[in-house]
Amino acid sequence: GSSFEHPATRSAAKHWASQTERKYINVQHEDSNGDVTAELYSQIVNPDTRLVTILHASPVTGISVDLEAIAAAIRSIAPEAFIIVDGVQYAAHGGIKIDQYNIDGYAISPYKMYSRHGYGFAWVSDRLTQMKHEQLLDGPDDNWELGTRDTGSYATISDVVKYLEWLGSKIENTD
């Protein structure tokens, strides 16, 4: 984790580090600009690092990080580490290029994209999908849902997607 991250992410990371008897490692942001960089992660991550969380954009400053470079730096030192990204703030403001990041998870919360509270979306790698996790008893191993979906929430995101498609059509460069 890093000092750049949302307190909820840091709290969960610290909790699970304690539960698994591992040291929580904190990447300190640059005081001059509030950013975290691949170089800063390279100074802290070690070959025994098992999980790294990265905030794609700050909810306080709006600063986004070079996710691809940070993930590459982590993989060069701890190739087996799971890399989980909080994309909640970034999703509505930047193009998400999952295939370029070499990460294991990316989560968003649609309420930050003109939708409602109470649900979210995540992309997980095949490697993370197969990891042992809390799940319904006797359910499929790759199921990460613990209950019934709120279908109203999914209906609202359909309108958001239509709006974003319309907005994107008005911009020349949609890379």
PLM segments and residue spans:
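Pyridoxal 5′-phosphate
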Residues: G1-D175
